[in-house]
């Protein structure tokens, strides 16, 4: 796309500011927009390492002023609450481990925002994600693998990608910060966001407890079936977790115990040794295929099961209710609710074939 009208989603960070600058420099008619996603007073804090704060809104506006582009703030709080925050709580209550950033991309940035942008006459949405989107419509990993965000974009549809721009995919984060400095953007040295933006203090367990209440239950040894501890809410745990178990009876062999599973129906957390976490087969639902048509035959590819997780070779096959991945080497800590993203290795940058939500 050349010389089109685009909406730049500006979070208040360095990546989105430079992405907007590059879009304008490429000849596009750029308008900046900051999304007001929460009305929780705790999110209005200074020096935050999350996002979506009042400070972020001001940083985004200042960046737009430097770039001399129009700037607006869109109130998306109600939609964000329903599609991201409430979904986050419901998933934990169901014993799954959601990825709220992925859900925000799927339901807010590239759905609600994109839909409104198109309705207002914009041709595309520009974001600061570190990923590459070529003229062929294929989504690839960023050249900066340490910052690559193709995993959290793997849930998008081909239609959504066709109206998206990711100008930073060919740059490293160091290059982006240096460019921000050259352009006089005050956010050049602003720290990256790491927290869940709507959990202001970083205490996910406390946030869930306030929403779901206290529901005491048993912590059970997966080998013996014996009760080895108590918990105040199974929702506070995730598969692979080691810290915070507070077991009354340590393992006879003295080795650490990890969360193997969460069973909401019985409010039980099952624990066991690290090797019991190893998984060689993954079932997933709600597949989205963006690297080509839905495969009729099993595909040899690579898969990633967490935002910053290991990448392993696998054979992926379509099933009646989703897909099945046979991992060529076992992975530990595979949690239902996370995404499995399939890649086709390519010298020009690994290509995202598709994604699905891990069921078991």
Swiss-Prot record:
Site (Interaction with tRNA): 129, 338
Places the protein is found: Cytoplasm
InterPro entries: MnmA-like (IPR004506), MnmA-like_C (IPR046885), MnmA-like_central (IPR046884), MnmA-like_central_sf (IPR023382), Rossmann-like_a/b/a_fold (IPR014729)
Disulfide partners: 104-197
Pfam families, A to Z: tRNA_Me_trans, tRNA_Me_trans_C, tRNA_Me_trans_M
Record region (Interaction with tRNA): 147-149
Keywords: ATP-binding, Cytoplasm, Disulfide bond, Nucleotide-binding, RNA-binding, Transferase, tRNA processing, tRNA-binding
Family annotation (HAMAP family): tRNA_thiouridyl_MnmA
Protein name in UniProt: tRNA-specific 2-thiouridylase MnmA
Source organism per UniProt: Salinispora tropica (strain ATCC BAA-916 / DSM 44818 / JCM 13857 / NBRC 105044 / CNB-440)
Lineage: Bacteria, Bacillati, Actinomycetota, Actinomycetes, Micromonosporales
